Amino acid sequence: MFFVSAVKDYLEVLSNITDTLTGTLSFDTILKSTLLYLATSTKVFVSYIISFEWFRNISYLPIIAPDLSKAILRENYVLDTPLSNLFTFFDVPSYTSNKFVLGLLNSFFLAIPISVAHLIAFRRFIIQGLPAGLTAGLGIISGQVCFIGAVLFGVRSLVIPWFATEPLSYLIGIFLILTIIYDMAHESRIRPINLSETPLLLKIFGLSFLLTWTEQSSVFQYLANVTLGNQATLLETTTVKTDGQFLLTHISYLLGLTAGNILFTLLFGFLLLQLINQVVKFSNLPYSLCVRNLNFGILTFTLALSITSIPYYGFDYLLTAPLGFVSQDQSLEKVSLRTNLPDAIGYLGQLSESKYLDTEVTPFDRGTYLTDFATPKTYESLNYQGEYFWNSRLDRSASVTQKYRALEFNPKKDSESEIPEQVGALSPDSQANSVSPGQELSENELGLGTTKTNKQVLLNKLDQNFSRNSNPSYANLLSEVLDYSFNESFFTTSASNAPQEVALQKIEFNIKQKYYSNPLYKALLNFDIDRFISHQPVAQRLNANQEKQLFENRLILSTYYDTLRDYRLLPYSSEFQTYFNGPKSYANRVYNQQFKGTLNVVRRLFAIDIEGDSAGRSTSNSVLKFDQPLFNNFKDSSLSVYHEELNPEAVRPTKKSPFLENTSPTPFYAGWDNIQRKFIVTNRLLAREAAGNEINRASRNISSATSALTAKDYTSLGDTVKLKFTSWPDSSSKGGNSKGVNQLSLPFISVPQEKFTQVVSSLGLEDDDFGSASSTLKLPPNIKKMFEVCQISIPEVFPPKRGGFIWP
């Protein structure tokens, strides 16, 4: 592709020289042009390599690839540049259109107050008076007109260097915005600005002018392609014949933009001022209070717009922008750093395990639930506020106990000299020095009640330290192996009935009851759960009786599976069943859940009950189900995944299909293959000295997989497949079997009588095998070579497009 473009450019250079110069081209002219072209091409190529422009073009390859394909098909190898759709310099000039009116209309999109510069100008107009507002508005209009004028008149020395400094220009804009907001927020008093304060007005004009060139936090970038003209953007460009027309056309367009921008800016300012007056009138609030609130709101919204533009210039853009990439370039998606690396080992957060780190982080790392901790943490525990408030209680108590947690990370080292002080086994000297006159010491205070030696105490502390340091790893290994669908008592200890645990359970109940008794929270929770359950297809949902029957059948099947377990033979099988809450295999569950989470909160709040109400009457409500059965949306389809245990009707009727279908119009031939050393049956057009067969087959009933097999499905002895082979060549006069041979449906070629002897000799046979020469000899049409040798005309046989098959 590069070579073709280079040759085409070289030929265009020679063609232009030929059109420019009169007369014929000399060899010297062609040589000079060739050398000049090679030198220019070499310079462009070196610059292309050094500037890394090739790296940017590689990123554009997915966009250019369709254009390359179209160019190859059209035999036109000249491609458009990426900017050809943005700036069209070769449109047909329209001398009748009024560029002033077009600029006047397009200025509406420039005057919409949706940028930070417009908000600051509007604040100056309301707070600092009319002169400050008009000065700020004129600064914005001047900045917009100067920028568009520089683009229209092609002032490259100003536009290209300015955009080449990006994102430095953006940082300058952020600095200006923060400076303006800081000055406005720290004003000693809010006062209007007079016309006599010329330096301050010039400062306001300059800041507004610079903000127009630097500020990017606006909606204008999303309205850049909105224009009332026939061009792609507001940057209207036209082609004219003379320089005078060029200046007149673009100056009239700029004048229209300026006049319309002033007009629409005044219009928007007047409308906003009337809106504020109406709000003050109907709110019955003092004007000073409304102005103070408006000042705070504008400054806050301005700062918010500035902050929202920061992600546009990310760290990746700062590194890749010099290489020609844009922000959030799709070409860099596969090379970005991964932010969803899972915790494969399971030790993330173990050092701070005392704090509650089980926060919902699945949008970031797509992590799994019920892992990395010794207690189950479900989807509801991390997302429902009533459950999450209780589980994250340690986070709120961290500030109170922070001074005591320093000992956990900087533990005090134990030594043998400190052990007697810890257990109370003090030395006599220390006891005598520590006892005041008249004080009596008990046996425990004297250390007489302790029977453990210092060595035993040291070993006990070593065991405790080892157990404390080993518990996190054991908990992780246990969390990876166990399934957290055990009974709740599996995770409780013998201290669960302690007074402290009972009091803690009461506190938990009161806290959760506060959430669940809130009408708004209750309505939102019901809406969330109902929305999840309603994901099942409504048109094909089971009715209440079918759900009840299905649930009962699943319970019976689950109980039956439980009876097949080996642990049923244990003497304490009932306690085993209660403790582990049934088998742990998902295939044996009553509900095979196919979604994120376990919905244990749903089980607690919306219990499943198929027995009926409190009076024993059967309810007709639907059973709450957690599985998502699949349905067949095509009624005409014979296959269905509908619950077959609920369908009392018969299965699909049987369908007759032939035992074997021939997919080729050619007949079958059988014979011995010397290469494969086996007897084969084939439909390929292969030459055989003796080949041919007839398959008389009977149709066989092939029942569906769902129907029960009966005796009629088996083929009887009389319907067995019969294979009858006929040897070739065949004579109708041999054995008086002409009638049987003529009934064959196999194609054959009748050998003329004058060729009888030649054909028989070519086959290596004797004439006596076929009687006299007047006998009719029939041969299969696949031995075409022998017919050509004997010069026998045969009809053309077209072989099948498929290669056929060889059996066995």
UniProtKB/Swiss-Prot annotation:
Keywords: Chloroplast, Membrane, Plastid, Transmembrane, Transmembrane helix. One of its GO terms (cellular component) is chloroplast membrane. The keyword Hydrolase does not apply. Residues 411-447 are annotated as: Disordered. The chain crosses the membrane at residues 35-55, 100-120, 135-155, 158-178, 193-213, 253-273, 295-315. Its main location: plastid. It is found in: Plastid, Chloroplast membrane. Residues 428-441 have a biased composition (Polar residues). It is a multi-pass membrane protein. Coiled coil: none annotated. The keyword Chloroplast applies. Belongs to the ycf78 family. This is Uncharacterized membrane protein ycf78. It comes from Oltmannsiellopsis viridis. The gene is ycf78.
